[in-house]
């Protein structure tokens, strides 16, 4: 077993669970607020702030809107564009607060339920169940290493669609993997696989997307459950295969094959069943399975807690308090991005970009109905908050149950903020050479986008 390298002491009490990690992430440490020490850096690495590229993206939204508005005024004779921009600023600021009201409840609920699952030992059991697979995919990580449990916890939060809860746990997992890294400034194979699987957005219960659809008045918020399940499975599979190819992983190992075959069998059976259904039946099946799975997970968490004699109410309140803190800290980011996207739409810049893409797609002979959903996919690799704002704006502009809005919601659930994840996770441990991480992660994102378009066309046609 490879020995773990000694690290400089962290000047904060390390969180030992999901809730504690989130409090740690949000800057509740007394000595270095909003910072974590990297084992390879003398100064704390700020992880509570967005990367520099997000500053450029946000500024670019306003500058593009200004150029488009000036063009409409000076060349098109439309001075009313500035009134539309100002009106959009205030309406989007109000919308941000409306969205946050439901987000407070959603995050508070699921953070409380996750705390019950932790204390009931479900996370530990999941780590044991996935241990044999991780030993084949990450052979350099010793059996029983703390990174395995943290990676499992990170994936559990991602599976539930709680990306804001997954990030702090993922940072702790990355730090544990760094203790096994023979080259402190170069990404190890295990770190690359972990990052790419994160960037592939493995989401089975996208509760945040259900919440946004509910807030926008969707008749059935869980309608996109099966499309997201299929699209995120495609992105994760492509991400895993691309890393396996680059790292020469032995996926034909009997144990790895058994896990992969089980997943493939389940997905294949699901797809085979879905092909027998009509379009109306597909939508109905997605609704039933989505609601049943969501409620089933809640019951499993509660029953597991009761069996393990966990005081479920007290555990729920303990986790729910931390969920409230997470939601509160998200409001400034939501206001910033929704207002920027609103200005971009009101100025006409977003419309020009969509029309240009539609012209190219039509020129190559493809159906253009999905083009209106592409802004969400295009900004998602750079910023989750920007993509979230694009999604909400698409719902408002086209209707929450329109084909563009359904496709955008599926894209949001099957892709990840690739560059943000790379910048934060690698920055926290001082990694500068990322090797094949970016290529594999972007390939997974592309697979998720293509699969989203194909699956939504299959499920919803061009409603």
Model-based region annotation:
Residues 57, 61, 83, 120, ...:
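Alpha-helical transmembrane segments of multi-pass membrane proteins, especially transporters
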């Amino acid at each position: 077993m490879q020995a773990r390298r000694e690290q400089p002491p962290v000047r904060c009490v390390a969180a030992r669970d999901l809730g504690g990690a989130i409090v740690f992430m949000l800057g509740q440490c007394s000595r270095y607020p909003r910072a974590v020490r990297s084992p390879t850096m003398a100064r704390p690495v700020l992880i509570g702030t967005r990367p520099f590229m997000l500053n450029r993206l946000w500024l670019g939204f306003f500058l593009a809107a200004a150029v488009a508005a000036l063009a409409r005024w000076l060349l098109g004779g439309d001075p009313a564009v500035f009134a539309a921009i100002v009106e959009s600023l205030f309406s989007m600021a109000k919308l941000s607060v409306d969205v946050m009201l439901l987000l407070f409840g959603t995050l508070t609920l699921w953070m409380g339920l996750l705390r019950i699952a932790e204390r009931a030992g479900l996370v530990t059991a999941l780590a044991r169940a996935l241990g044999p697979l991780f030993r084949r995919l990450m052979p350099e990580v010793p059996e029983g290493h703390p990174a395995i449990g943290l990676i499992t916890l990170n994936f559990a939060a991602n599976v539930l669609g709680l990306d804001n809860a997954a990030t702090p746990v993922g940072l702790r997992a990355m730090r544990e993997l760094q203790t096994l890294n023979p080259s402190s400034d170069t990404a190890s194979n295990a770190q690359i696989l972990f990052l790419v699987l994160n960037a592939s957005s493995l989401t089975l219960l996208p509760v945040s997307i259900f919440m946004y659809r509910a807030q926008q008045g969707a008749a059935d918020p869980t309608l996109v459950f099966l499309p997201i399940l299929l699209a995120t499975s495609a992105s994760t599979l492509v991400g895993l295969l691309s890393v396996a190819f680059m790292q020469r992983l032995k996926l034909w190992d009997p144990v790895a094959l058994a896990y992969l075959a089980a997943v493939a069998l389940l997905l294949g059976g699901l797809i085979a069943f879905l092909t027998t259904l009509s379009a109306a039946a597909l939508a109905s099946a997605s609704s039933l399975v989505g609601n049943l799975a969501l409620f089933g997970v809640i019951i499993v968490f509660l029953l597991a807690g009761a069996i393990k004699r966990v005081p479920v109410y007290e555990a729920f309140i303990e986790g729910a308090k931390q969920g409230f803190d997470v939601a509160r800290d998200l409001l400034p980011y939501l206001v910033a991005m929704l207002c920027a996207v609103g200005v971009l739409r009101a100025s006409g810049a977003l419309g020009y970009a969509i029309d240009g893409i539609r012209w190219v797609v039509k020129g190559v002979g493809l159906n253009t109905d999905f083009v209106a959903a592409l802004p969400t996919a295009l900004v998602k690799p750079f910023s989750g908050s920007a993509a979230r704002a694009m999604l909400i704006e698409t719902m408002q502009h086209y209707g929450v149950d329109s084909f563009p809005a359904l496709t955008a919601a599926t894209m949001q659930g099957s892709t990840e903020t690739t560059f943000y994840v790379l910048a934060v996770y690698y920055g926290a441990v001082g990694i500068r050479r990322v090797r094949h991480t970016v290529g594999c992660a972007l390939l997974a994102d592309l697979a998720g986008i293509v699969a989203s378009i194909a699956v939504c066309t299959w499920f919803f046609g061009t409603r």
